Every structure is written in C-alpha cells, then in structure tokens.
C-alpha cells in the first residue's frame, strides 16, 4: 500500500476523540474511525475579559448531518450559488442557533504527550512518494546574526492560511492542481510536516475545517492550547461533502505561555455584522512575566470588496486598542496599546489597499514583519499566494504578520520560495498543501520598549 494513503498509527490515535458529539468520517486505514467534536460556544472573555470584547458568535453545528459512504455530509439545500459569501446574506439571514456553552478550557493537559520528532518522521514516511516541500531558509534582517537570549528567548510565530478542505476540493477551482494532490488523507501530512518542521510557539491558522478531528487533538498532544472560531456562515457548508464550517484557529505552546484573556470577535463593517471573525488572546510569557496580545483574522475575499475589508480592519483595530489597554493586576492605569501586539492574518488585501494603510499607520505602532526581508526594509514580498484558477493566474501578497515595533523586535524570518521552487503549476500542488505560503518569524521583547507594559 502506498504509505501516503495510509494513516500512521500515531496520527490516527491522536485524531480519535474530542469533546462533544461525534460524526462519522472517512475511516483511516489502519486505525479507528475519528470522531469530530461537537460545537463550541464563543466566550466573550477568559479570566480577564473586558474592553474590546465583541458580541458572542454562535458556533454552527452541521444540522441534519448525514453520511454518504462514511464521509460526513452537511446538506445545505439544492442551491449551487455562492451561499454565505456576500455581505447581504450575512445581514438578511437569521443568526444560527446558540449552542450550549462548554466549560472553559482546557482538557488538553490530560492528553498523553507525543514526541514531535517521532510524529515528523511518520509524516515524512507517509509522504515519501511525494516531492519534497520547498526548502526555505531563516533570514536575519539587516545582516544581524542569530541571537539567543537566555532570559528573553525568541518567540516563534507562524501565520498560515492552510486552505479549507471543502473549498480546495469543491469550490476554489485550482485547475492545474490534480484532485489527488488535494486528498485530505495525504494533504494533512504536508500541513503537519510544515508545522512540525518549524515548531512555532504561536500558530495562527485560517480556513481550518478539520479543527476538532485533526488539529486540536494532534497539537494538544504536542503541548499546544487551541482555540477555534468558525465563520457564522462558512462557504464550506455549501459544498456537498464537507467537514463542517471553516474558521480561524489560534494555538500557543503551554510550556511558554499562560492564558490571561480571550476575545472572540465577529467583525463589523459600517456598524453591521459581517461573516468574518477574529480571535484575540492575551498571553503571559512564563520566562519573563510579560504580556503579549495575539490576534488571528481572515478578512473578506475577492476584488470589489476593498471598502468592506477596510471597514473590517478598522473595527478590528478599535477592538485591539481596547484589549491592549486593559490593566493587569496591580496596575492603576494603562496607556492605549500598552500590551505588545502581534496580528496574523490573511487580509485578502494587497499593500496598496486602504486596510493595509490603516494597519501601517495605526496608533498601535504596528509594522509588517515581512517588509524586513527587503533591501530597504519597506517593501513587502512579491507574493504570499500564487494560484491558477479558471479566471486566470493570481500572484499576490495577501498575508501578514504585524507586530508592535516599539516593544518587539524581529530576529529572523522564513524566506519566500522562488518561482522555480513553487513550480509551473503554482499552488497548491503535490509538494505544497495550500495556495497560501506559511509566514514565520522569531520575535523577542525589546530590552527597553518605547512603551512600558
């Protein structure tokens, strides 16, 4: 049997259970059938909620889920149109039913821990008949050498739109990518191999539609705490064979951080709710005791929606100003933006768009990390996504890691693969699992930040 078509014993064990009800899915061979977790409730805050926390967002449960063979199906009617993808439908449809809340996180601590080296070897074994992923290098801005801080170690952050499985197979139309290359039983290994190769301390993902059956159990066993927020009306649910809604996920390594507060945001535009979301968490670094606010988001896609993306970005920035101004215990007051901030996301916006200018000129003092790869330190990469669809070839810079430049410094970044490495068929492909490239940087707290925390 082709090893790329079997699930390793370890990975299949990790994908067996999660909290809540179960839904049948394609059986793994060998190994037990995985169970999808039930829906989760969005909470307005954890431990230290407060300013900047938006309305709670219901987590949709696939209603009337049925099975075709053994793959989950969430029927959404006979329509083959672009359901849930427009502003008007977000406004006109009634909100999804509010699920019963779950107890606060986290049962992850009870899971047996997995050796990441062993899991990486199993991924490599399962992928041995596929071409190798593009080899990428860590680049140190301005020729600075690698720095190691004994009492202030670097924090590795990864940003990645991993491509929702339902969209890759059913809607996105990657005409130069063979359907076999998008097979989830193979593609999940490529995604996990990328994560395990770089082992981020903080992982921000978009288009996650296999959170409960894959990413949450696997990453929890590797020592991560995970949070997930689905889009209110995910386009994945318009695909006949789907695994539930897609959304944003945020993971952090429990050995490095403790959680102070969480905000689940449904972004608004012109005071009206939209279909895009964000997760914002305030973390406490165990080594230094310093706080770090991390946000993950995914703004409205497609050309023609620039004004909505700008409004969504403005709404997110307002929330972040409130959240990063929250006082910690013992403080009498806090200045706006007092907590250092990292914002990761697929903004679906080129640097020429207004939403990019909003972030770069924000009072929060944000800078885009990947500008530091350029010779002048002011130019974004030529692309973070490169795909071919029926409408043509698209090579764009849409993904960003923003950071508070007065309080944080970027030590190194993962370079961008060349056109030759990506290949003539572009992304996704047999050797890369998504149409978006992962972004990764090491950051550290400045010894003397411009603003006290």
What are the language-model segments listed below?
Residues 2-144, 201, 211, 321-342, ...:
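Metal-dependent phosphoester-hydrolase catalytic domains
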Residues 104-154, 202-301, 305, 394, ...:
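Structured beta-strand-rich core segments of catalytic domains in phosphoester-bond hydrolases
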Residues 157-158, 343:
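Residue-level marker for buried hydrophobic side chains located in beta-strands
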Residues 162-185, 236, 270-271, 303:
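Acidic/histidine-rich helix-loop elements
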Residues 184-188, 309:
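A conditional alpha-helix N-cap/helix-loop micro-motif detector
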Residues 188, 193-208:
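Proline-aspartate-enriched helix->loop->beta-strand connector
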Residues 277-284, 291-295, 307-345, 349:
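His/acidic metal-ligating clusters that form di-metal
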